[in-house]
Each structure stands twice: as C-alpha cells, then as structure tokens.
Amino acid sequence: MKRLLGMLTIILGLCGVVLAQGSLLINGAGATFPYPIYSKWFDEFGKANGTHINYQSVGSGAGIKQVTEGTVDFGASDGPMNDDQIKAYQAKNGTGILHFPTVLGADVPTYNIPGVSTSLNFTPEALAGIFLGRISKWNDPAIAGANQGVNLPANDIVVIHRSDGSGTTYIWTDYLSKISSDWKDKVGKGTSVSWPVGLGGKGNEGVAGLLKQTPNSIGYVELIYAAQNKITYGAVKNAAGNFVKADLAGVSAAAAGAAKTMPDDFRVSITNAPGKNAYPISSFTWLLLPEKFKDGTKRDAMKNFVKWAITDGQNDVEALSYAKLPKEVVDKELKALGKVM
C-alpha cells in the first residue's frame, strides 16, 4: 500500500511538472472598470500563448496595494498612482512602476426612478449637489430645469457610491473636483473618499445591484455595467455646454486633446475635457507594471501581452462599450515598453 501511494505521489508530481512547463501563471489584481475586456483579453492571449493570467477584479485601490506589497505580478487602476503611492512602491520594491493605458471608458450617472424611464440630463451643478447631499429631492429645480416635460417625483434621492477603493470612484470624484470648488475643498478626489451621503456597494457590480433594488436611487458605474444590467443612465452637460450621453464617439472626443500631449509617464486626466462632443466623465485605464521584474519569463510575457492588447486587442474593445486608444498613445506606449526590464 505504501509503495502504491509512493508511486501515485511520483506520478502526480510528474504531472505537476508537465503542467508547470506547459503553462505560465501570472497574477494580477485591480480595477473592475475594465474587467469585461480584461477577462476577454486574458482568455484570448492565454489560449494563444500558453500563459494563464489570473486577474482579481477587486478595485483599483486594492490592486495598487497588492502590487505594492508584491502579492501580485501586476496591478490595474482607473486612476493613475499619485506621487506618494509611487514613492511607497519604490521604497518597498527597489524599482519603479510604469503605467500603460489599455482602453478608454466612461463613468455614467445611473438611476432608478419608478415611472421615469427616459434618459435625464444632468448639469455639473446638479451632480455635485446630489452627491454633496444638498439636492435631496428628484423634483428639485436643479434637476427639473434641465429636464422640461419629464414628470419627476418629489421623492427623496438615495445616493449610492462605491464602498471599496475604486478607480471608478477616482474618475467620478476627479470630475466633481473639477466642476465644483465645494466638492474639491470638502471631499476631494481619490479611489476612496469620505462620502457626505449615501449607501456603499462593492465593485461596479455591487453598485449596479444596489441601484436595481433601490427605488429613487442614483449612482455611478462604468458604461458597460449600465448596459449589461439594463440600468437607465443620463447625459451630462460638458465643458462646451452640450448635454452628451456616453458613447464611444464621446469618449474618443474627450481623449483627442490628451492624445497629442500625453506625458511620458501616461498619467493624465481627461475628465471635463474641451470639445463640443466630448463626454465629460471619460478616462483611460492603466495596467501597472514593475519597471524591473524579478522573473524574466513573466516580464517577457507581460510585455508581449501589453503589445498585443494595445494593437490587435483593440479590435475587441468597442463591442464591450470601450473606446480604442488613439494611435498617438499606442505609438508612445510601444516605445515605452522598452523601459520594462
């Protein structure tokens, strides 16, 4: 019996060696915003290259934390790491961290108002007022004034926000900080903030779920989550004074200016961008790669993945409600991949 068990142990061990040699495992964690496209990409790339990329959709804040602590090989975030976070990463890991934009997306104001199925218009002032808790009724003049002919109820507004560290929150609060000095001074921007009002949901999925089950609620999710969950979302008044509902053209228009002046570290904000057709709550989302990998095989695989994702992989993005990267950004990234050692 012992001999049989010993033989089984050897056989299973050999099987493990074969599996290990046939497939490379890379671990990553971070943003939920791009998870639908990342899931598709990692599956496609893995099948073609024998690389299994295990990605945890845990939120940008957790992704930054995990990549800094070295518990994953790469991170992902919808908000670029700030200077303090980069310094903390360098101190912990003895190398730098690089940002690589992968796609463009949009945060949208989503709501669940019984009896109202039309797409509402939201001014910047109305959104800031709602999330500050100063506008508390759906028929408030700040909302009704931009939605003539819509019978809005006198019901209390229930604000829903993210409860976890979130790049989607970073985009939303970055926008609110640009259009409202009160928001900037009292709340500010970040992957996590001290919310003045509201209920918290974990992940884009959690916010979408809360919205669907909470009458008279308003929240924010990435565009694909609104579409997948069949949640109504509204148009937002942009910097040019036009109400724009999020779509691929509007997101691309928001990125047009930044594409020509992209900084070398790719850390840029495109919320409240100029342009008559620009959707104002748009953003790049980034993969976070160590400047120097400890494992050369993983380094080569991730460099190949990024190269594929920002070129051939862009053919997949529009079907999932993301916008393609501008050519100027792709060209700059391909050169920047040389910094990954």
Residue ranges and their predicted role:
Residues Q21-M341:
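Flexible loop/hinge segments at secondary-structure junctions
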Residues M1-L8:
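Bacterial N-terminal signal peptides that target proteins for export
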Residues L14-A20:
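Sec/Tat signal peptide C-region and signal peptidase I cleavage site
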